[in-house]
Curated annotation (Swiss-Prot):
Disulfide bond is among the record's keywords: no
Pfam families: MORN, PIP5K
Region (Disordered): 22-56, 646-665
Gene Ontology molecular function: any one: 1-phosphatidylinositol-4-phosphate 5-kinase activity
Activation loop: region residues: 728-749
Protein name from the UniProt record: Phosphatidylinositol 4-phosphate 5-kinase 5
């Protein structure tokens, strides 16, 4: 596949010479070619709709073609059904060139793209995207070799910069994220965690003179607990920040040397000289190129077709004459443009270090749990189900359809509004070939969920990348109480839950009311649904697996140190794990709660209003057994991992009278009073608050909410209402009747929806209060 640069230049000279001839012959090229239009009958519910579509003409053939196109572009290579298909070479008149594999007019397989500047990409392509393993070499010497997903660096990759710097590590959506090592040209290097292309999290910076810093970082600078070590063995331990008033720590000399006259600010000044190179930008992206094959005035415009692996270029022009082969790079205004995170709002992003004990004092950061879930790789019992799911999602989301409207007709909510599609292994006109077993795919109320994704501001390309990218899904270790299985996308943004038929009926029955509710209340706390689907496996059992795609509430830049599932009932509402097994992933319950949460006044009023509205909606739909899922990130901790109460002082050196910086309560209040800076937070997401510790009385009377102690902690909160698909059916009525004989009826979860709503609100309004 690989061609040297001289070959590219020679080929370009050929096409330039032919360009002038092409302009004279433009009217004759493809003059007799026509293609009948076709439509994708996706709205049918017939299981055999694929078999009824028109097959390609038997007169069409696979042959080698060499053509100068109407605009002067040049193509030579294999040709089939009016498309480049097989191996071929395409040259644009501006100097760009592609040599490689094609499939139905799209780059698919291995290939090489060259720019007139001398820049090249050589590697794998998929459905027109740079996707797989590939190497990009810039004209000035920048080079990246590694994994790509839908035109973005995504996965593991190594990038060398023209100035001599180099990065080896993980990438996500075009930026460094995860674990990685960046080495500067002078030999100094950083190894540790990255976020959104910057040093963020836990890591170490090592200078060539032997000095090093180990600790936490934010936006490329030390922030939080850390240790600076000199090569002679001396070290400085403390809390680091760009704000001098927040800096505090202790110097520990080596041997008998005295105190060092050293200003920690010198470290920040030194680090300012070490910048992360952004690398070269491609002046003309391949996404800006078009193929002139479809640019004939005598051809009938065809609608977009689904690509061979199920993807569709999202956001491209619908006309094939403007069809792009690549999506926009991040940073070019594409859908994957990252919004600036709210780093100024929160002071720390400390990772969980120690286990939170139930002993009175001191409270500690909980033990950090492992990344949740088992990666579904080849050989996993649900590997083929995952492949089927991903193929179906690509088809559903990428399918050509009118622009989603928020004003829907009642017929869109009809439970009978569903689309069946067969996915044979060899592929069809509308589905790609695949290696999984044959299956059928069903979309429930597709127009409604397309509108919901638009309402929730979910970009289709980003949605597909999260669920259908190269990274596999993760299956949670154990099924839920309902027997459902849960799957997480690798970026933690979406959760997929298998559904019982009864739950599917409940969701479809309440879908119209749910849609109107979340549209009317932008800050609704009810869980967000993005799609409802079914996979029918081929075989004698004809097994059906229904599943719903939801937002993952705890997808946040902040580590969730504590998780609570709150219902307002007491029977069985405590964790049955021993304390030694409780970590940051453990979901605690009502009787485990030892905090009252205090929200800033404006947010508290909005919280009260929204809880009332959401509960009224659920009560009207006869839903019960839902809960408020709460996640807490503690913002302040000592070097030893002990939580620092709000207003507490941190010792410096050996003097107990010296005090460290005050916590940022006033700053948070000031920030919240500035509406222009509210964009980074919304109700239930990344909310600053104070958590007041509570203690339950040691007597026989059960206390659902403990007594406040006056001990406050600065926290970041994430919360939302989950499990909203359980109606008060006959099984729940029987459960209530049976348990009422044995226990206090008010302590049981299974109660009438009206009573459940009232009890739930009473409890939540005791746990959440105004921070006055």
């Amino acid at each position: 596949m690989s061609k040297d640069q001289s070959y590219v230049l020679k080929a370009w000279e050929v096409t330039v010479r032919k360009t002038q001839q092409a302009k004279k012959r433009a009217n004759s090229v493809f003059g007799t070619v026509s293609v009948a239009p076709h439509t994708d009958n996706d709205t049918t519910t017939d299981d055999n709709d694929d078999e009824t579509t028109t097959n390609r003409s038997s007169l069409e053939e696979f042959y080698h073609a060499e053509r100068v196109l109407p605009n002067g572009d040049y193509y030579t290579g294999q040709w089939y059904d009016s498309f480049p298909h097989g191996h071929g070479k395409y040259l644009w008149t501006d100097g760009c060139m592609y040599i490689g594999d094609w499939y139905n007019g799209k780059t698919m397989g291995n290939g090489k793209f060259g720019w007139p500047s001398g820049a090249t990409y050589e590697g794998e392509f998929k459905s027109g995207y740079m996707d797989g393993i590939g190497t990009y070499t810039g004209p000035s010497g920048d080079a990246y070799k590694g994994q790509w997903v839908m035109n973005l660096k995504h996965g593991h990759g190594v990038k060398s910069f023209a100035n001599g710097d180099a990065y080896d590590g993980e990438w996500r959506r075009g930026l460094q994220e995860g674990q990685g090592k960046y080495q500067w040209s002078d030999g100094s290097y950083y190894i540790g965690e990255w976020k959104n292309g910057t040093i963020c999290g836990k890591g170490s910076f090592v200078w060539t003179n032997g000095n090093r810093y180990d600790g936490f970082w934010d936006e490329g600078f030390p922030r939080g607990n850390g240790t600076f070590k000199w090569d002679n063995g001396s070290f400085y331990v403390g809390h680091w920040s760009k704000d001098p008033e927040e800096m505090n720590g202790t110097y520990y000399p080596s041997g008998n040397e005295g105190n060092l006259e050293w200003d920690p600010k010198d470290l920040f000044n030194n680090l300012s000289e070490y910048t992360i190179c952004s690398g070269e930008r491609v002046p003309t992206l391949p996404s800006q190129k078009k193929l002139s094959v479809w640019n004939s005035s005598k051809r009938i415009e065809k609608p977009r077709r689904t690509s061979v692996d199920g993807r569709v270029s999202v956001g491209v022009d619908r006309a094939f004459e403007k069809m792009n082969m690549w999506g926009n790079e991040i940073g070019e205004g594409g859908a994957d443009m990252r919004k600036e995170l709210d780093a100024e709002l929160m002071r720390l992003d400390a990772e969980g270090l120690q286990s939170l004990k139930s002993s009175p004092v001191p409270m500690k950061l909980p033990k950090a749990g492992r990344k949740q879930g088992e990666t579904i790789s080849k050989g996993h019992r649900n590997y083929e189900l995952m492949l089927n799911l991903q193929l179906g999602i690509r088809h559903s989301v990428g399918r050509q359809a009118p622009a989603a409207s928020l004003d829907l007709k009642p017929s869109a909510f009809d439970p009978k509004d569903k689309i069946w599609r067969r996915f044979p292994r060899e592929g069809t006109k509308y589905t790609p070939p695949h290696q999984s077993t044959e299956f059928k795919w069903k979309d429930y109320c597709p127009l409604v969920f397309r509108s919901l994704r638009k309402l929730f501001k979910v970009d289709p390309a980003d949605y597909m990348l999260s669920i259908c990218g190269n990274d596999a899904l993760r299956e949670l270790s154990s099924p839920g109480k309902s027997g459902s299985f849960f799957y997480l996308t690798n970026d933690d943004r979406y959760m997929i839950k298998t559904m019982k038929k009864s739950e599917t009926k409940v969701l479809l029955g309440m879908l119209a009311a749910y849609y109107n509710h979340v549209r009317a209340f932008e800050n609704s706390l009810v869980i967000r649904f993005f799609g409802l689907h079914c996979v029918k496996l081929n075989g004698p059992t004809q097994k059906k697996v229904r599943f719903v795609i939801m937002g993952n509430l705890f997808c946040s830049k902040y580590s969730v140190h504590r998780r609570f599932d709150l219902k307002g009932s007491s029977l069985g509402r405590t964790t049955d794990k021993p304390e030694s097994e409780i970590d940051s992933n453990t979901i605690l319950k009502d009787l485990d709660l030892n905090f009252i949460f205090r929200l800033q006044k404006a947010w508290y009023q909005e919280f009260i209003r929204q809880i009332d509205k959401d509960c009224e909606f659920l009560e009207q739909e006869r839903i019960m057994d839902y809960s408020l899922l709460v996640g807490i990130h503690f913002r302040e901790a000592s070097v030893a991992g002990e939580l620092i109460p709000s207003g507490a002082r941190t010792p410096i050196g050996e003097s107990e009278e010296e005090s460290g910086p005050r916590l940022s309560r006033a700053e948070v209040d000031e920030l919240l009073s500035d509406p222009s800076r509210w964009a980074s937070i919304r109700l239930g997401t990344n909310m600053p608050a104070r958590a007041e510790r509570t203690m339950r009385k040691n007597d026989s009377e059960l206390q659902l909410v403990g007594e406040p102690t006056g001990e406050f902690y600065e926290v970041v909160m994430i919360f939302g209402i989950i499990d909203i698909l359980q109606d008060y059916d006959i099984s729940k009525k029987l459960e209530h009747a049976y348990k009422s004989i044995q226990y206090d009826p008010s302590s049981i979860s299974a109660v009438d929806p009206r009573q459940y709503s009232r009890r739930f609100r009473d409890f939540i309004f005791k746990v959440f209060t105004d921070d006055n």
